[in-house]
Design a protein with these regions (language model features):
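Class I S-adenosyl-L-methionine-dependent methyltransferase catalytic core
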Residues: 1-222
Length: 222
């Protein structure tokens, strides 16, 4: 709903369908069947729309190889997970394909709440495994904690921006994206960081457009 008028506002899937020039195909993935049912009712029997009610990582690892450079295919992938749920393998696969540009909401809130705790013994094995899956390896254990101990003997976590910069570097150096501009922090009403909005591509033109979008978002008070 629009906060000012109270009128319904189109969600991002329906807005994507209205983009001109239009994409040849649209692939929407969500584990929430109810959301997909609403979208299915809105799009009807359009042959260019594909809906997947499953884990997005599994679906993307099937879709990405079909976007072939040799067939002059290109794709824009928007990753907006519920939390720290994107598998690093998906990002690596997209980078290797060289045909896919990505916007990605990286959940710093989830990391701070569940993984980067002062007392690391309180981090469950499940949460530890989620971080390993999202980061791709165990390097985060060295990169995201300072070497200085607190008064209570715990290693202090680095600040949010340092976490974001470390992930930016991984997208470039490890995953293999050529162009990874500095991300933008997405904040709540109390100005606390929720996500970092990343763009990753093999295309400098796409990166320039992303930088302009990020700059505009920052200037209007994001």
């Amino acid at each position: 709903m629009d906060r000012a008028t109270g009128e319904p506002v189109e969600g991002s899937p329906l807005r994507a369908l209205d983009i001109r020039p239009r994409f040849e195909e649209f692939h929407f993935i969500d584990v929430d069947r109810g959301k997909l049912d609403v979208l299915r009712a809105a799009v009807g029997d359009r042959a260019d729309v594909f809906l997947y009610n499953e884990d997005a990582n599994e679906a993307l690892l099937r879709i990405i190889p079909t976007v072939k450079y040799s067939e002059f295919k290109r794709a824009l992938c928007v990753l907006d997970p519920y939390g720290l749920d994107v598998d690093w393998k998906v990002l690596v696969a997209a980078a290797k394909q060289k045909t896919i540009e990505i916007f990605f909401n990286f959940s710093i809130m989830d990391i701070n709440r569940n993984i980067l705790r002062h007392d690391r013994d309180t981090v469950s094995q499940k949460q530890y495994n989620r971080m390993m899956r999202a980061w791709g390896d165990g390097s985060w254990e060295q990169e995201l904690f300072s070497r200085d101990e607190s008064l209570f003997g715990y290693l202090e976590k680095v600040d949010n921006w340092t976490v974001a910069k470390a992930f930016q570097k991984r997208l470039h150096d490890v995953a293999g994206f050529t162009c990874v501009p500095e991300p933008v922090a997405m904040k709540n009403s109390k100005k606390a960081d929720l996500y970092y909005w990343f763009f990753a591509s093999q295309n400098s033109t796409g990166a320039k457009i992303a930088k302009d979008i990020f700059k505009h978002y920052t200037q209007v008070g994001g």
